[in-house]
Design a protein with these regions (language model features):
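Substrate-binding pocket helix/loop in short-chain dehydrogenase/reductase
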Residues: 99-112, 194, 205
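Short C-terminal tail/terminal secondary-structure segment
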Residues: 148, 208, 225, 236-249
């Protein structure tokens, strides 16, 4: 049911962590994968090499998703190289942990540009291809702070909450074309923060989770694969948490 043979996927921020795990699992299920990166070319090309080594098809694409014109060129390149697009995973994000009272408009802009406008730009440019597919999928990744709020993450939470509303709206608008749009909200993933900070605070952090550990990229990729496949064809407009029991709302 999670067979993705013949499908083409774009994963933003696909060179590292959760994005890399998603790329690899989609490829394992048979999808051709466009691995987007902003600055980590070596990482993205490493993911491509791993996929190709196991007989899969993948290519790295450099693009700042906050720039609408650059995104349009990337989508056009994917169409030219692969023939279309069936799956969009809005994974790339940028979040600064800082008290709201100490944050600046420059901080706000950087996070909103990547987290909200990035999803807007990619969804808008990919939309015609996803609708033409007849089985298009949009899956947006975010932190659970976008659902329940969190001190120090006000801007990132607000930007990602906007993405949740975008997914729900696109689920309604594009559903008649067979497109589904869902959000996955995450607890703290091991690879998403500075390793030294995680180790210094691990004992305190894990106490917030019903399952007493932090998340791994491998915890996220299976749900993305499900939603991208025919098995997820009747799931749309939803926010699904993969969070070890951090929040249960």
């Amino acid at each position: 049911m999670t067979d993705l043979k013949g499908r083409i996927a774009l994963v933003t921020g696909g060179g590292r962590g959760v994005g890399a795990a998603i790329c690899k699992m989609l490829a394992e299920r048979g999808a051709s994968v466009a691995v987007n990166y902003h600055s980590s070319k070596v990482d993205a090309e490493g993911v491509v090499a791993e996929i190709e080594k196991t007989g899969g098809r993948a290519k790295a694409y450099q693009a700042d998703i906050a720039d609408a014109n650059v995104v349009k060129k990337m989508i056009a390149g994917i169409k030219s190289d692969f023939g279309g697009l069936d799956i969009l995973v809005n994974n790339a994000g940028l979040v600064f942990r800082k008290k709201f009272s100490e944050s600046t408009p420059e901080d706000w802009k950087k996070q909103v540009d990547t987290c909200l406008y990035g999803a807007l730009n990619c969804s808008h440019s990919a939309g015609p291809l996803l609708e033409a597919s007849g089985r298009g999928r949009i899956i947006s990744i975010m932190g659970d702070s976008s659902r329940v709020g969190e001190s120090g993450l006000a801007i990132g939470a607000a930007a990602r909450a906007g993405t949740i509303a975008l997914m729900k709206s696109l689920a309604r608008e594009w559903g008649r074309s067979g497109v589904t749009a869902n959000s996955i909200s995450l607890g703290l993933i091991e690879t998403a923060h500075d390793k030294a900070w995680v180790e210094a605070n691990r004992d305190k952090l894990v106490k917030a989770y019903a399952i007493r550990r932090l998340g791994l990229p491998s915890d996220v990729a299976p749900l993305v694969t499900l939603l991208a496949s025919d098995a997820g064809a009747w799931i749309t407009g939803q926010v699904i948490s993969v969070n070890g029991g951090y929040s249960m709302v």
